[in-house]
C-alpha cells in the first residue's frame, strides 16, 4: 500500500471517530496494517496530519481528530454529486461535508456539527456529530424487486443509501408500483441502509393519476380528502335564512357577473356595476362568503388551515375546501342567490374612489363569462388588446354583445386603475405561461402559451383595488394609534446584490438599467427594461433573471408594503375558496366591524408563516406537474430538431429552452467534445480552452431531443449544428 492510498484511509478513520482517542494498536488493527513497513508509513503520515492540525497528539502513541472551535448547529444539504454542505444557524455561508463525515444525513435535517481543523490547501470542512431532527420520515418512489430484496427507487437521487422494505411491510405493493414509504430504522455505524414500511401504494408507475398523486406525495401534499371532512361538508345547509337577508345588503337586482377561466368551477369573485347620480359609477367586488359556512376551529377549518391553498396541477385541482363547498355552496354560480362579502366602490369617470364600504351582501349573478368571451366582446367593439386604450365611443346602434355596455364600462374603469398604478411605481411583468391540452387519459396532446389579456386585467385591477382597500381600512390609522392585527401580503424591496447581477447580465444584451435611487426610480428602470426586451428572443430569459432579483411575496402581520404593486397596504381578501389567508382576513374584518378587540399577533403570524410555506410547496408541485407533462409531450418527439436558446449554464452542461414550446433540457458537458470547456460563473458562459469558443446565456442554439426520462422529469439534448 502506498502513501497515496493509505493517507485517505487514515483521514476517514479519524473523521469517523470524532472525539475518540485512537492508539497505534487501534489504528493498525482497524486498517489491517500487519507489516512493519506499513505501520511505520502510517506513523509518518500521522505526524504530517498532526503538523497540518488535522489530528492532535494525545500521547506518544495515540492521536485524536482535531475538532477546532465550538460545536454548532445547522441544516444539512445533500447533493447528488457528493458536494454536501451544512448551512450554520448563524451564517449564510455553507460549509462542505464529505460523505464519510455526513452520518448519512439527508437534505433539511437539523444537525449538530463541528468544524474540522483546516488542512493545507483544503477547503473548510465540517463533521456531523449528531442528527437532531429529521426533515422528513416518509419518501416517495418506485418499488424495485431483486429476488427477495425490495428497495425504493427515489427519482430525486438524494438518499444517502438505499431504503430496504421487508416483504411483510409491503402492504401489497408490487414491483414497479409507486409508493409512499415511512422509515422505521435509520442508518447507523453497523447498518448503513434505511429500513422502511409502505404506508400507501399509489399504483403502477406511468399511469397519469398515479404520477400526479406521486408528485403531491413527494411534497407531503394531500391527494385524498379525509372522510370526516367530506361528511361535515355534506351536513352544511345551503339555505339562505330570513335572518341572512335581513342582515345583508341586497344586490340581487343589480347586474352582476363572474369572469373566470373556461374550465373553472369555483367562482370566488363577481363584479356588479350600476350608474349613480352625479356621473358616478358603483362597482361591487363580491367575494364568496366562505367564513359564513366554515366555522373557525371546525374539522373543515382545521383541514383548510393544514392545506392553506388549493393546488393546480396541469390536469386537476386539489381544492382547499371540500367540493360541496368550493364548487357548489360558496361558489358564485349564475342564477343562484349567494352570500357574499363585498367591497362597494363609488368611482368617478377617472376611477378615483369617492367612497367605499365593506359589507355583507346577497347577490345573484346574471351571467358566468369565460375570459375568452369577454375578450372577444371587447375586441369586436374596437378594443385593441395590450394598448391600454378602452373601447371608442358607442356607434349609433350601441355596442355589440350581451351586457356590452356594462362590460365595456368595467374595462374602461379598470384601465384607468391600471394606468394610475403604473404611474405610481408598480412593476410590469407580463409573462407567458405554458399550458397543455390533455386527453381523457391525461396525456398531453397540445402545448400552447397563455398571456394575460385585457379581460384578465379587468378582473385583476378590481381585485387589487379591493385587496388594497381592505388592507387600508385596518392598517391606515391616525398617527400615534396602533392598527389592529391583520395578515398582509407583503413584498420587500429587491436584493441590491441580485439587482447588480441583473444589471451586469442585461448589459451583455445591450440594455442599461439603474439599480439605485428611490423605489419609484427602480420600478421605472425595471419597466423600461421589460418594454425594451418585449418581443425579443431574450425576453423570457431577462424576465426570469429579473424575477430572481425580486424578493418573494409572503404573508405577515408586519406590514412593509408591496414593492411590486407599489401599494403601502395590501392584503388578500378576494379568494377565500382557494387561499386560507383570505378567510382569515374575512373573519377579522367581520370581528372588527362588530367592535371586537385586536386579534392575537403571535397566533396570526404563525398562520401567515405556514400559509407562505404551503404556497411555496404548492407552487413547486405545480411546476413539477408542468415539467412531467413537458417531458411526456417531448417523449414522442425524440430525434426532432428545434431552434432553442441557452437558458442556464452549469459546470456539467448547458440548459437549453426550445423556442416554440419553452420545454427545457440539458446538453451534458460530455457532448461538447470539440474542446475542453471551463465554467465562467460570473459571465454566465462556458469558454473553450483551445479554440476559445463560447456558450453564453441567451445564445441561440440548435438542439436535437436525445432522450426523455419521465421518472426524473428530465430531457436530454444534443447539439444539432449551427443556426
What are these regions (language model features)?
Residues 1-284, 291-337, 368, 373-376, ...:
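Charge-lined substrate channels and their catalytic hotspots, especially those that engage the 3′ end
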Residues 29, 180, 185-187, 204, ...:
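Electropositive polyanion-binding surfaces
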Residues 93-98, 159-165, 662-673, 677-679:
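A short macromolecule-binding patch
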Amino acid at each position: 500500500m502506498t502513501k497515496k492510498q493509505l493517507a485517505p484511509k487514515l483521514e476517514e478513520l479519524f473523521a469517523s471517530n470524532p472525539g475518540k482517542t485512537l492508539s497505534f494498536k487501534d489504528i493498525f488493527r482497524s486498517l489491517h496494517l500487519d507489516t512493519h513497513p506499513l505501520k511505520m508509513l502510517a506513523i509518518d503520515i500521522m505526524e504530517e496530519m498532526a503538523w497540518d492540525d488535522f489530528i492532535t497528539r494525545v500521547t506518544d502513541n495515540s492521536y485524536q481528530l482535531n475538532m477546532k472551535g465550538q460545536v454548532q448547529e445547522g441544516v444539512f444539504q445533500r447533493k447528488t454529486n457528493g458536494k454536501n454542505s451544512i448551512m450554520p444557524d448563524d451564517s449564510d455561508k455553507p460549509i462542505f461535508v464529505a460523505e464519510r463525515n455526513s452520518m448519512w444525513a439527508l437534505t433539511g435535517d437539523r444537525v449538530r456539527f463541528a468544524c474540522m481543523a483546516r488542512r493545507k490547501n483544503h477547503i473548510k470542512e465540517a463533521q456531523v456529530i449528531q442528527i437532531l431532527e429529521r426533515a422528513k420520515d416518509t419518501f416517495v418512489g418506485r418499488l424495485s424487486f431483486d429476488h427477495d430484496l425490495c428497495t425504493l427507487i427515489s427519482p430525486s437521487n438524494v438518499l444517502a443509501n438505499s431504503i430496504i422494505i421487508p416483504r411483510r411491510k409491503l402492504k401489497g405493493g408490487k414491483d414497479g408500483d409507486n409508493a409512499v414509504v415511512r422509515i422505521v430504522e435509520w442508518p447507523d455505524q453497523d447498518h448503513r441502509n434505511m429500513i422502511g414500511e409502505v404506508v400507501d401504494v399509489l399504483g403502477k408507475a406511468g399511469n397519469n393519476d398515479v404520477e400526479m398523486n406521486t408528485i403531491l406525495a413527494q411534497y407531503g401534499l394531500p391527494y385524498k380528502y379525509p372522510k370526516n371532512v367530506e361528511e361535515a361538508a355534506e351536513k352544511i345547509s345551503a339555505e339562505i335564512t330570513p335572518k341572512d337577508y335581513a342582515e345583508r345588503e341586497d344586490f340581487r337586482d343589480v347586474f352582476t357577473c363572474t369572469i373566470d377561466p373556461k374550465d373553472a368551477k369555483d367562482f370566488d369573485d363577481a363584479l356588479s356595476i350600476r350608474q349613480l347620480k352625479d356621473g358616478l359609477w358603483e362597482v361591487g367586488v363580491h367575494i364568496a362568503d366562505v367564513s359564513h359556512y366554515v366555522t373557525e376551529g371546525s374539522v373543515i377549518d382545521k383541514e383548510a388551515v393544514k392545506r392553506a391553498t388549493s393546488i393546480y396541477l396541469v390536469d386537476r385541482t386539489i381544492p382547499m375546501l371540500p367540493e360541496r363547498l368550493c364548487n357548489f355552496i360558496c361558489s358564485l354560480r349564475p342564477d343562484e342567490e349567494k352570500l357574499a362579502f363585498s367591497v362597494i366602490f363609488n368611482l368617478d369617470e377617472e376611477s378615483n374612489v369617492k367612497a367605499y364600504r365593506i359589507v355583507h351582501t346577497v347577490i345573484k349573478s346574471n351571467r358566468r363569462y369565460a375570459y375568452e368571451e369577454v375578450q372577444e366582446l371587447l375586441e369586436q367593439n374596437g378594443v385593441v388588446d395590450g394598448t391600454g386604450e378602452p373601447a371608442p365611443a358607442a356607434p349609433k346602434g350601441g355596442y355589440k354583445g350581451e351586457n356590452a355596455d356594462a362590460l365595456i364600462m368595467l374595462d374602461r374603469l379598470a384601465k384607468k386603475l391600471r394606468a394610475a398604478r403604473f404611474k405610481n411605481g408598480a412593476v410590469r411583468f407580463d409573462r407567458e405561461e405554458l399550458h397543455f391540452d390533455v386527453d381523457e387519459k391525461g396525456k398531453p396532446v397540445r402545448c400552447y402559451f397563455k398571456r394575460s389579456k385585457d379581460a384578465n386585467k379587468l378582473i385583476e385591477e378590481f381585485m387589487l383595488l379591493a385587496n388594497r382597500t381592505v388592507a387600508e381600512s385596518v392598517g391606515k390609522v391616525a398617527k400615534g394609534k396602533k392598527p389592529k392585527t391583520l395578515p398582509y401580503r407583503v413584498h420587500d424591496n429587491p436584493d441590491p446584490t441580485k439587482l447588480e447581477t441583473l444589471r451586469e447580465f442585461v448589459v451583455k444584451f445591450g440594455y442599461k438599467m439603474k439599480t439605485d435611487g428611490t423605489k419609484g426610480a427602480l420600478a421605472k428602470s425595471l419597466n423600461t427594461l421589460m418594454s425594451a426586451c418585449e418581443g425579443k428572443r431574450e425576453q423570457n430569459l431577462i424576465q426570469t433573471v429579473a424575477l430572481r432579483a425580486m424578493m418573494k411575496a409572503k404573508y405577515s402581520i408586519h406590514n412593509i408594503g408591496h414593492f411590486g404593486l407599489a401599494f403601502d397596504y395590501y392584503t388578500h381578501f378576494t379568494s377565500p375558496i382557494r387561499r386560507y389567508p383570505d378567510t382569515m382576513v374575512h373573519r377579522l374584518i367581520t370581528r372588527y366591524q362588530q367592535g371586537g378587540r385586536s386579534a392575537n399577533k403571535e397566533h396570526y403570524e404563525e398562520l401567515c408563516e405556514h400559509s407562505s410555506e404551503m404556497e411555496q410547496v404548492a407552487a413547486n408541485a405545480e411546476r413539477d406537474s408542468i415539467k412531467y407533462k413537458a417531458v411526456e409531450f417531448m417523449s414522442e418527439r425524440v430525434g426532432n430538431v428545434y431552434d432553442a436558446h441557452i437558458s442556464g449554464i452549469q459546470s456539467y452542461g448547458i440548459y437549453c429552452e426550445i423556442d416554440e414550446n419553452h420545454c427545457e433540457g440539458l446538453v451534458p458537458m460530455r457532448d461538447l467534445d470539440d474542446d475542453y470547456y471551463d465554467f465562467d460563473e460570473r459571465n454566465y458562459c462556458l469558454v473553450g480552452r483551445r479554440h476559445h469558443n463560447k456558450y453564453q446565456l441567451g445564445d441561440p442554439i440548435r438542439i436535437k431531443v436525445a432522450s426523455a426520462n419521465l421518472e426524473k422529469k428530465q430531457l436530454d439534448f444534443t447539439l444539432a449544428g449551427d443556426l
